[in-house]
Amino acid sequence: VVAGPGSGERTIDIVRRTPVAVLLAALLCAVFAAPSAAKSPTVRTELQRLQTAGEIDGPTADGYRKTYGSAKTTLKKLKGFRRVQLKAVLANVDATAAGGLFIPSRLPAVFVTLQRNRAWWAASPLPFAGQRVTFAPSQIVWQFYPGQGWQIQWLGTFGKANALWMVKTRDDDLRRLLDEALALATQRAGGIAFEYLFQFDGGRPPWVSGLAQGTGLSALSRGAVRLKDTKYFDAARSALGIFKVPPPSGVLDKTAAGSHYLQYSYARRLHIANGFTQALNGLHDFATLANDGEGRALFSAGEAELRVELPAFDTGAWSLYAKPGAESDLGYHKVLRDFLRGLCDRLTEDQARQAPPAPSSTAPPSTGGTPAGSVAAAPAPDPALYCDTAQRFTTDLTTKPALTITAPSALRAKAAGTVRFTLSKVSTVTITAVRRGAVVLQRTARLGRGRHTVGIRPTKAGPLLVRVRAVDLAGNAGAAAATVHVKPAAKKDKGD
């Protein structure tokens, strides 16, 4: 079922001749040293180790061995694109075993991933990049990553769970999805985590995401209320683990202001605004719905940091995707806007709940104190920053790029020169030079905000009209023009 979204070779050095005696000595050392060299764990040896230790039972281990063997057999029959995908999935499984990362709770996700890929690449149609599917009757969402095969898409899975919660008539599907997800969770960072088991953007499996885990917190907490089952609160509470532990196990990056929750556990220095914001939304949902003090503390530490970080992600004309990094593409600009709206709404509701009730003619006068036996709630954070930033990001979608040309006082014919301009936000920019109605130069490129320089070499003297047109990612167009005076070419010395 389609779920719908989302060369050089190394240098070969010269080989120098080795004296025979030295070569024989080296070979003998290698022969005698070989038995003592420790071999890396393999899938089969790791499964046997876990079975011998009683950590997995015989039938379970046999099932994993069968899945692995079937995948290896299928790989031998495949060629080209299909072979590349299944080989990559097998390589990830092998690397997980070799790294000593086979633990009982991780294996269900590892081997169901291998099983799904073996079946797909043996017979199913070639997918397109980013395609998402579910394998009925399962509710788990999978995504195709070229070069990594089919992988569990936890963000998509929990996004689907939240969508089922909103429908209100598909509680059975919601329960099935949450139960499936929990069956595939891994023990990590002192709790459970929903791991990604493939290589992505420099990260090696298994890694976790504050964005996906935060979305999972929302789904589990909402499910606990809707389905009237506190086991989902218990699961969400256990899923807080990665927010309390730094990489590589968790996503916590402690700061002077509080805590940043990373989008990728393998990228400690990369702060991504949309993932951080959504992690906070999930923590807030759990803390509020479960009335959980630890969840509330984690949210508060993160919100304090986002309050410091967020202004730097607003360029005044568009959003930045990450720090360090460039501007967001159109999709991520909208995603960040929407996540900020969600945080704005949550904090606005918090303030409304804390507002004093309207005065009643029958109520006794307030003494201004706190009732005995109760604890005064901490004031809700001011939502204005998040509400206002979301609104500015919405306005950005209909605001044309601003351009300013800084033309040189003069150019000279047949000599290299430059024209400088400033652009307010990422856009596709076309620079055109016109002489007497004829286009003599035109270049187009996608450029980010800031100052840019265009090289130009006029062939003739006279006025030259330079036009710059920018179309932003939302389709808004801005333009600027300037006339540049081109002087005659410099005269050559008679001695030349």
Residue ranges and their predicted role:
Residues 40, 55-65, 72-84, 94-106, ...:
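Structural helix-adjacent loops and short alpha-helical linkers that scaffold large soluble proteins
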Residues 117-150, 171-193, 233-255, 293-318, ...:
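Long, well-ordered core segments of solenoidal/helical folds
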Residues 129-148, 191-209, 253-274, 314-335, ...:
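Carbohydrate-binding/catalytic loop surfaces
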Residues 423-428:
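Short proline/glycine-enriched turn/loop motifs at strand-loop junctions of beta-rich domains
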Residues 39-155, 166-197:
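Low-complexity, Ser/Thr/Pro/Gly-enriched N-terminal "stalk/linker" regions
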